[in-house]
Amino acid sequence: MDAALRHIVDQVQAARADKSVLDIHGGHTKAFYGGLPIGRPLDVRGLSGISSYEPSELVVTARGGTPLAELEAALAEKGQCLPFEPPRFTEPTNASVGAGSVGGTVGGMVAAGLAGPARVSVGGVRDYVLGAKLLNGRAELLAFGGTVMKNVAGYDVSRTLAGSMGVLGVICEVSLKVLPVPPATLTLRVEAEQGAAIRRVNEWGGQPLPLNASAWWDGMLVLRLSGALAAVRAAADKIGGEIIEVTTAAAFWAGLRDHRDEFFVGAAKAVETGACLWRLSVPPTTAPLKLSGEQLLEWGGAQRWICTTAPAALLREAAHAAGGHAVLFRGRDKGAGAFAPRKPVLARIQRELQLAFDPDGLFNPGRLLPE
C-alpha cells in the first residue's frame, strides 16, 4: 500500500471512529450533479496514474484520481479511445478546489456514470468496466472483476459502481475496455422539426448504417457517421444533408459532450435565475413532449434535455407517462431529490447494497438517494 492510498485509508478509519461523513471528490467538476455534497472532503487526486495499458488487449487500468484528460491522451497516442465519450466538465463547481483542479477523474467518471453523444450506439460506462478496486466503509480494499472480458468473477459488482455516485466506497482503481478510433467519421446537418427528426433518426437507426450519434436542437438535426470509409460514404449519400467540415464537426461534438455548446451555456445561465435543466430518458420513438422551455435531443430521441421553470412533478409525470424517467441535472432546489424516485423494491435493494459496503453511511450521503 503506497502513501497516497494509506492516507485515504487513514481518513476513512478516522471518519468511522468519530462518526463523521465524507465527501469523496477528485476534480469536483460534478459537484452539481445528484444531491448536494456534504461532509469532510476526501480528496482522491493523490491516487493518480495509469497502472497498466495493453493496447493489443484493448484494456487499460488506471487509478481513481487519474485525470480523465491524461487517460484519454494516452489512449489517443495508440489510436484508441473510450468510445462512450465521457464528458469533461472543466469548471470547478466547489470553491475549495480552486485553480488546482485537474478536471474530471477516472473514478468520478465511473461514479457519475455519464456518457456522451455516442452512448446510444456503443453503450455506456458500465459496459466498459472490467474490474475495480474499492475501499469500503470498513477501510477494506476490495477487488472485483479483472482485466479481461472472460474473467467474470465479481464482474457485475464492478459494473454496479457505474452511476453509484460514490455511495459504495472510494473507487481506487478501474480496469476498462477500450476500442480503436473509427477509421472514418463524417458529420451531416439536416433541417427538420422535432417530430420529423425523431422519425427519421429512428428509421436510419433501424437500418445497417454506421450512425454513431445524433443531436437535434432548434430545427436542426446533426448526425455523426463512424466506421469504415466506404460504409460512411455510402450512408452519407443515402441520408443526404450538408456535410460539416471536420474541425467544425469535432468542435460541435466536443461541445455537446462537455456541455460547452450554446444550448448548455444558455441553460447554465438560466439555472442561475431559477430555471432547472432536466434530463429525460424515454423510448427513442416518443413523440415530442409538450413541455415549456427549450429542448435538445440526443441518442436518437432517447435522451431529452429540457431547460424550464415548470414544476418538478410535471417533468417527472411526463417522463413516466412516456415510459421513462426524469433527472434534475442542474438546479438550485434539490429538496425532492435529483433522481427519479425508485420503486420500493429497487430502493430497498440499493439501500441494502449500500449497507453491505458502507454500514456506517460514511460516503457521499444523499448524493444518490435522499437521506
Provide a role label for each language-model segment.
Residues 26, 223, 306:
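Residue-level signal for inorganic ion chemistry
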